[in-house]
Design a protein with these regions (language model features):
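An acidic/histidine-cluster motif and surrounding catalytic segment
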Residues: 1-131, 139-170
């Protein structure tokens, strides 16, 4: 598993002070937990950017035409027939990194400011908020969505299960 994490947040030090461990440890732990929970048969790769509200707003505007800061953005590289359905991937060489053979899942962009603000708003730790947003984004990278009520309920249950299994309780 390769997780490339870039930190471009002026608030990263503030976030670190509110976490019980390094952001990368939580991110890696949750990415692995999601892949395990979803029975992913492949070694995978994902890129994660921790940034501030100004940058995530700019990315949101450029990529989604929404001029607003948000907590997390997900940019999947794989188009799943149905969520976490890996069937037929062995023949789709373009989905894999040529040197490592890892399945290229996509990109996650996190706002350090939103992580801290939402943890306070929801009355839980920054660890839990970072874990939640990482799990949420990873499920998007695996083809899940929450546009319809049934999809939302499925995704929310998976998030709860993954976070509970990893020990990140509300």
């Amino acid at each position: 598993m390769t997780v490339n994490i870039e930190n471009e947040s002026e608030n990263l030090q503030k976030l670190r002070e509110k976490l019980s461990k390094e952001p990368g440890e939580i991110i890696n732990e949750i990415i692995l937990a999601v892949l395990d929970h979803e029975n992913c048969p492949y070694e995978c790769a994902a890129d994660v950017l921790i940034t501030d509200d100004d940058m995530i707003r700019q990315i949101n505007k450029e990529q989604r035409d929404i001029d607003k800061a948000t907590d997390v953005l997900s940019f999947p590289m794989v188009d799943f027939a149905s969520p976490s359905d890996f069937e037929g991937f062995d023949d789709r060489y373009e989905l894999f990194e040529p040197d490592s053979g890892e399945l290229l899942l996509g990109d996650i962009v996190l706002s350090a400011e939103h992580i801290m603000a939402q943890a306070e708003e929801y009355g839980h730790s920054c660890d839990r908020e970072l874990a939640f947003l990482t799990a949420h984004s990873m499920l998007h990278l695996l083809g899940y969505d929450h546009m319809e009520d049934e999809e939302r309920e499925t995704m929310e249950q998976k998030q709860r299960d993954i976070l509970d299994e990893a020990g990140y309780h509300r």
